[in-house]
C-alpha cells in the first residue's frame, strides 16, 4: 500500500507513475478525500476535548449547587454525543473509502524502470548460453512426455478438469528432483532458510502480500473462507506480519518448495496445451525481508541466485527488466528470467524477481528499528521464483531431447535420480 503522506507531498509523481502503468491519475481525488478525513478527525478530537471539559464543569457547577448551569452543561454534553456519533461514523466511512482506493493502487516504479505499455517494451539485459541445434525437428514437451507414456493429460482431465497433468515414472521423479535440487542450492549455497509453509491462509495474509482485493478472481477460496496459496511468497512474506525487527537481524532470507494454486481466470485461451499454465504446480520461492538501504542490492543478488539454477542445469536463458506496463502490482522493479524452449522456438518466463519497497511491509504492519533511531520503519520485501518447477521440467525435456525421443538427464540432477542418465519409453 502507498503512503498517503507521500501522495500529499508528491501528487505529480503518483499520477505520472499511474499513467506509466496505463491507469488514470488519482492524486487529486485521494488528496481531497484525505483532507475531508483529516478534517473530520480534527473535529472529532475537538468535540471530545470539549465533552471532557464540560463534564468537569458539570461537577464544578454541582459543587456550588448551580443546578441551572449544570443542566445547561448536560444539554451541551448530549449535543456533543450526538455530534460525535455522526462525525465518527463519517470519519470511519471516509477512512474506509480512502483505504479501499489505496488498496487498489499499484506500487510506484523505480526511476530506472523502462516506460512502456506491455511486454513488447521490456528490455533484455543479458543472455546465457546458446539455443541448442538439432539435426531433427525438436518436439514440444507435451509430445515428448506423451510419447514417453509418462505425461498424461487425458487422465488428469478425468480427475480434475483442464489445466492439470499426471506425471508418472521417471518424469514424476524428475519433477521431484528438480524441486529438491533447487531448494538444496538456495539453502546450502545461497544462504536462504528453508521453510515449510501452510498452503491455506487467511484473508489478511493474502492482503498483506498485496493479492487481495485486486486478484481475488485469480485465487481459489475454500468453503471456510481461507485461500489456497498462489505462491509461497504469500506465507513467506507474512512470516514477519505485525512484527518489529531489529535492523541487525536483516536481511532475512526464506525459501520454500510448495504446490501453488491459480485459477488462471485471465488466461482463457492461452497455453491451453501442456504444462505451461496449470491450476496446480510446484515452485521454489525465494523471499527476502530487508531494510530500505539493503533492498536494491538484494534484488540483484536474488536474480543471480535464480540465474544460477539455470546455469547449473545448462539451460539457455535471457534476463529482461520489465517495463512499467508489464510489471506486477506490488513491484517497484522486476527482472524476468526467460528460458529457451526449442519446441516453441522462443523464450518463456521461468522466474520473476521483484523488489517491492515497503509496499507489502505497510500492508503487513511489519517494521524494523534502526540502531540509535527511535522511529520505526516499514520493512522492504523482495520475492523471486527460484524457479517454477513445472516450467523447468518443460525446459529440460525440450533442451535435452534426443532424436529417438529420449531425454538426457542433466548432470546435476543425476544424483537425485538414482544415477539415471537417460529417460526413455
Swiss-Prot record:
Molecular function GO terms recorded: ATP binding; serine-tRNA ligase activity
Cite the CDD domains for this sequence: SerRS_core
What keywords does the record list, in alphabetical order? Aminoacyl-tRNA synthetase, ATP-binding, Cytoplasm, Ligase, Nucleotide-binding, Protein biosynthesis
- Please indicate if the UniProt record lists 4Fe-4S as a keyword: no
Going by the entry's taxonomy, the superkingdom of the source organism is recorded as Bacteria
Tell me the Gene Ontology biological-process terms attached to this UniProt entry: selenocysteine biosynthetic process; seryl-tRNA aminoacylation
Entry's family note: Belongs to the class-II aminoacyl-tRNA synthetase family. Type-1 seryl-tRNA synthetase subfamily.
Q: What does this protein do?
A: Catalyzes the attachment of serine to tRNA(Ser). Is also able to aminoacylate tRNA(Sec) with serine, to form the misacylated tRNA L-seryl-tRNA(Sec), which will be further converted into selenocysteinyl-tRNA(Sec).
Q: What HAMAP family has UniProt attached to this entry?
A: Ser_tRNA_synth_type1
Name under which the protein is recorded: Serine--tRNA ligase
Q: What is the lineage of its organism?
A: Bacteria, Pseudomonadati, Pseudomonadota, Alphaproteobacteria, Hyphomicrobiales
**Its gene?**
serS
Amino acid at each position: 500500500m502507498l503512503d498517503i503522506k507521500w501522495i500529499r507531498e508528491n501528487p505529480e509523481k503518483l499520477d505520472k507513475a499511474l499513467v506509466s502503468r496505463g491507469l488514470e491519475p488519482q492524486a487529486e481525488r485521494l488528496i481531497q478525500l484525505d483532507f475531508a478525513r483529516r478534517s473530520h478527525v480534527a473535529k472529532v478530537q475537538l468535540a471530545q476535548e470539549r465533552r471532557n471539559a464540560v463534564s468537569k464543569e458539570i461537577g464544578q457547577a454541582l459543587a456550588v449547587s448551580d443546578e441551572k448551569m449544570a443542566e445547561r452543561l448536560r444539554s451541551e454534553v448530549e449535543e456533543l454525543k450526538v455530534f460525535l456519533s455522526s462525525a465518527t461514523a463519517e470519519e470511519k466511512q471516509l477512512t474506509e473509502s480512502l483505504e479501499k482506493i489505496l488498496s487498489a493502487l499499484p506500487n510506484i516504479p523505480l526511476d530506472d524502470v523502462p516506460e512502456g505499455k506491455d511486454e513488447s517494451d521490456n528490455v533484455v539485459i543479458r543472455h546465457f548460453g546458446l539455443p541448442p541445434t538439432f539435426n531433427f525437428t525438436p518436439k514440444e514437451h507435451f509430445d515428448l512426455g506423451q510419447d514417453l507414456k509418462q505425461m498424461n493429460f487425458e487422465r488428469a482431465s478425468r480427475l480434475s478438469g483442464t489445466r492439470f497433468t499426471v506425471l508418472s515414472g521417471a518424469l514424476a521423479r524428475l519433477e521431484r528432483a528438480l524441486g529438491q535440487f533447487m531448494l538444496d542450492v538456495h539453502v546450502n549455497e545461497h544462504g536462504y532458510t528453508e521453510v515449510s509453509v501452510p498452503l491455506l491462509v487467511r484473508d489478511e495474509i493474502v492482503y498483506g502480500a498485496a493479492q487481495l482485493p485486486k486478484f481475488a478472481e485469480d485465487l481459489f477460496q475454500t468453503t471456510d473462507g481461507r485461500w489456497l496459496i498462489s505462491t509461497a511468497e504469500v506465507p513467506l512474506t507474512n512470516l514477519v506480519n505485525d512484527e518489529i525487527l531489529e535492523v541487525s537481524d536483516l536481511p532475512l532470507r526464506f525459501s520454500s518448495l510448495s504446490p501453488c494454486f491459480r485459477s488462471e481466470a485471465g488466461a482463457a485461451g492461452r497455453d491451453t496445451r501442456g504444462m505451461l499454465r496449470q491450476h496446480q504446480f510446484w515452485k521454489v520461492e525465494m523471499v527476502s525481508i530487508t531494510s530500505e538501504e539493503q533492498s536494491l542490492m538484494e534484488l540483484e543478488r536474488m536474480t543471480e541466485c535464480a540465474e544460477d539454477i539455470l546455469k547449473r542445469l545448462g539451460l539457455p536463458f535471457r534476463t529482461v527488466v520489465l517495463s512499467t506496463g508489464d510489471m506486477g502490482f506490488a513491484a517497484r522493479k522486476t527482472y524476468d528470467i526467460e528460458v529457451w524452449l526449442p519446441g516453441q522456438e522462443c523464450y518463456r518466463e521461468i522466474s520473476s524477481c521483484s523488489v517491492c519497497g515497503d509496499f507489502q511491509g505497510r500492508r503487513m504492519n511489519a517494521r524494523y528499528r534502526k540502531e540509535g533511531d527511535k522511529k520505526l520503519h516499514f520493512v522492504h520485501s523482495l520475492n523471486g521464483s527460484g524457479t517454477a518447477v513445472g516450467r523447468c521440467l518443460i525446459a529440460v525435456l525440450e533442451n535435452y531431447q534426443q532424436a529417438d525421443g529420449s531425454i538426457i538427464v542433466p548432470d546435476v540432477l543425476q544424483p537425485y535420480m538414482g544415477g539415471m542418465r537417460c529417460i526413455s519409453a
